[in-house]
Amino acid sequence: MITITLPDGSRREFEGPVSVMQVAHAIGPGLAKATIAGQIDGGHLVDASDLIEHDAILRIITPEDQEALEIIRHSCAHLVGHAVKQLYPEAKMVIGPVIADGFYYDIYSKRPFTPEDLAAIEQRMVELIAQDYDVVKHITARHDVVRLFKERGEDYKLRLIEDMGPEVTAMGIYHHQEYVDMCRGPHVPNTRFLKAFRLTRISGAYWRGDTKNEQLQRIYGTAWADKKQLEAYMQRLQDAEKRDHRKIGKAQDLFHLQEEGPGLVFWHPKGWVIWQTIENYIRRVYRNSGYGELRCPQILDVSLWQKSGHWDNYKENMFFTDSEKRTYAVKPMNCPGHVQVFNQGLHSYRDLPIRYGEFGACHRNEPSGALHGLLRVRGFTQDDGHIFCTEAQIEAEVTAFHRQALQVYADFGFENIQIKIALRPDKRLGDSLSWDKAEAALRAALSACEVEWQELPGEGAFYGPKIEYHLKDAIGRTWQLGTIQVDFMMPGRLGAEYVDERSQRRHPVMLHRAIVGSMERFIGILIEHYAGIWPTWLAPVQVVIANITDAQYEYAEQVHKALLNQGFRVNIDLRNEKIGYKIREHTLQRVPYLLVVGDREKENGTVAVRTCSREDLGAMSISAFVERLQTEQVV
């Protein structure tokens, strides 16, 4: 007998091995119809057809469960393959993973796919779903899978199988009628679960992500548990399109990118004002938190990067240059340079913690196809800081950083913060005791701050665990920004030492920390978060003064000078245009305040105040308006 325990504590007994679907049927036909997969003993997910061969705790997964989304999306990727092979038999399927909010499938085809092809593929998927067919899984011997894909000419599937170790002797093959694909699963048992999907776009990709390899075509899509969720997501996409930082950046004359410098940003005066405002804000954070700001070279001999480990683990993403028979690397990260500053002199344990901060310009050789406006670039500047401390000081330093980070995010208008701890991976440096201490220190720091967090087992770097800060923006998208990372490796590799209380030389712990991360990416996120409607303290132009007629010319100049003297960013519009035209133009430019001056304002020494949201605040004295502006300044 096999006993299956359900989440409510009830038990069902079966005479022998039983599938998830059979258990669902035993409970009731309604549950069976809704069953997508199962979770065994609170751990891994299995297909509805998989047999349970021992006593187990079973949770049946339905579309109501969060886990169902990934299964639905992965199954939709296979459905893309089914549709593509019916429409374009010569195409060769590569991989089709799940990504945030959706999925994609990479395909090799000599024939470039067009938007019309995308629509045809989507329509064929709808037709296949309407057939309401079962998705059938067979565990198949490796040699039979090889034979199957050879017969079908699926060269990329064969290459993927070649990459698998010899221990893989069998694999799951999922049958969508005549179409087959391999996967660990689980997948939906029937196409009726795939109705709420949409194909969104086509882009280019490279086999194994290497530009030296053949180019593939990537079909992106999204899938949800029901039509309502799909419609809500598509609405969010429309909202995101309106907030696209590239469009707003062009409309507000903030920055541009061009072909001669892929992934490198040209900042225009207005955009640079925003940059400098954020930089000055972060500089104040450095100063108030005991950081010494420094500046390190842009290029360093490769010998340093070999010592740091970047050469072995990161050289494919680095830029190099040669001079006088020496090879230099353009820095992709700032940390090795900060260690060099620390090493200039021997430190006592009494000196620790030592905190360094830098607006460090870095360059990384990102694939051209991955570049995306300000959000993915090759040249970027980080608010990069490093703390050299003892193991006993980790908790206090992390606690201080956490409080500092939350205040920064609040000042920029982010209140919904998710916190995650990435824990030790299987392959790692350092002993288990050091990892125990580091992970315990991160947990203790967050506990002291009375916040909740999610733990991510196995997702820490090989040199230490880290805390990640994920921020939700105005339309519900999540962005990973800040991190604080414990590093046991680099101080030792680069010879960083201090003298402890027993006069012994020891390597300090190094904490890598950033609050906003890449300044370019952060500004891109802010543009989309605010939809270009900047808070007054960040706005490149905070106030525009507009006269009604030439009779107010001199008075408008006086107001302009008075506000400039107070340190505000002010423009003046004295053009011979109708005041309505001026108001519309500056409102569209999202200038926070427009001050209109006519004869009445000139006579009374006031200004008529309007906001970019078209709110009329009436007449104010200049001093009253200055006071209002000052209350809105963060820096």
Curated annotation (Swiss-Prot):
Textual note on the cofactor: Binds 1 zinc ion per subunit.
Matching Pfam families: HGTP_anticodon, TGS, tRNA-synt_2b, tRNA_SAD
GO cellular component term of the entry, any: cytosol
Positions bound to Zn(2+): 335, 386, 512
Enzyme Commission (EC) number: 6.1.1.3
Domain TGS: 1-62
Subunit structure, interactors included: Homodimer.
Record function comment: Catalyzes the attachment of threonine to tRNA(Thr) in a two-step reaction: L-threonine is first activated by ATP to form Thr-AMP and then transferred to the acceptor end of tRNA(Thr). Also edits incorrectly charged L-seryl-tRNA(Thr).
Annotated protein name in UniProt: Threonine--tRNA ligase
UniProt source species: Xylella fastidiosa (strain M12)
Gene: thrS
